[in-house]
Regions:
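Catalytic histidine-centered segment of alpha/beta-hydrolase-like enzymes
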Residues: 244-257
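Flexible "cap/lid" loop of the alpha/beta hydrolase fold
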Residues: 102, 109-141, 147
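Gly/Ala-rich beta-loop-alpha elbow adjacent to hydrolase catalytic centers
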Residues: 89-93, 97
Length: 271
């Protein structure tokens, strides 16, 4: 079973709500630490660590594909069935959350996707991305975690972090990345990286639950993806956070919490 941490809501008014939070690649549940205290005033929170990350102990002999992760999430969420569950996922966690919303056994009441894609639509681009994922996996295995993190931090995707985050926060995120196991990260990339994600675009119109998409203004690629998703998801709202890039929850934590709490409150009013 996946590793998780449960934080019970301090609010009797929202005692039936549960927000499940899934982190991104080369990360773990601690990425959400600064949000827990505030969010727990409005909802119970469950942070779950994906295969190969943090304290997860998924067996290396298993294939960590999306069907496997869905089954693992089913097991965890079975314990929390009494709650009205909204699932949030960032980037890799967002792709996982979207897959779960469409294929999981436990019905969700809402879905929050932060900087996430429904997958790659054409085979040529998919093949290219599988090669990129494989190259990154080899860097992790051969060069090690520090070399990989140094390269990862230089990606244009994260350029806005230097302006939007304090030095202390950037250091905290760096230390979290460096604490990951490079061999297990390599397996995660190969098993459920973007290249190996099923194309979920054709299924988006089947989402019957409310969906909230959060993207940073500077993250043009994912702003474009969000707007295309909004066109086909029946009950969808898109929030473009000013000045932020890909990692909205760490670049503008306050605005992220405002959006999430607002979405949860709307869901509760509609029950």
């Amino acid at each position: 079973m996946l590793n998780y941490n449960f934080y019970e809501s301090k609010s009797k008014e929202h005692s039936n709500q549960l927000l499940v939070m899934l982190h991104g690649f080369i990360s773990d549940a601690s990425t959400f630490d600064k949000h827990i205290e505030h969010l727990a005033k409005h909802t119970s929170v469950l942070t779950i660590e994906l295969p190969g990350h943090g304290a997860d102990q998924s067996l290396d002999t298993e294939t960590w594909d999306f069907a496997f992760i869905q089954q693992q999430l089913d097991e965890v969420l079975q314990t929390f069935r009494k709650y009205d569950i909204t699932m949030h996922g960032y980037s890799m966690g967002g792709r996982t959350a979207l897959y779960y919303a469409l294929h999981g056994k436990i019905k969700l009441e809402g879905l929050i996707l932060e900087s996430a894609s429904p997958g790659i639509q054409d085979n040529a681009s998919r093949s290219e991305r599988i090669q990129v994922d494989e190259a990154r996996a080899k860097v992790l295995e051969i060069a090690g975690i520090e070399v990989f993190v140094n390269d990862w931090e230089k990606l244009p995707l994260f350029a806005s972090q230097s302006e939007m985050m304090s030095e202390d926060e950037r250091q905290r995120i760096r230390e979290m990345r460096l604490a990951q196991n490079p061999q297990r990260l390599a397996k995660a990339l190969r098993d459920y990286g973007t290249g190996n994600m099923p194309n979920l675009w054709p299924e988006l119109n089947e989402l019957s639950i409310p969906v909230c998409i959060i993207v940073g203004e500077r993250d043009e690629k994912f702003v474009n993806i969000a707007e295309k998703m909004e066109d086909v998801i029946p009950h969808c709202e898109v929030h473009i956070v000013s000045q932020a890039g890909h990692t909205v929850h760490v670049e503008d934590a306050k605005q992220f919490d405002i959006i999430v709490i607002g979405f949860l409150n709307k869901e509760e009013q509609n029950d």
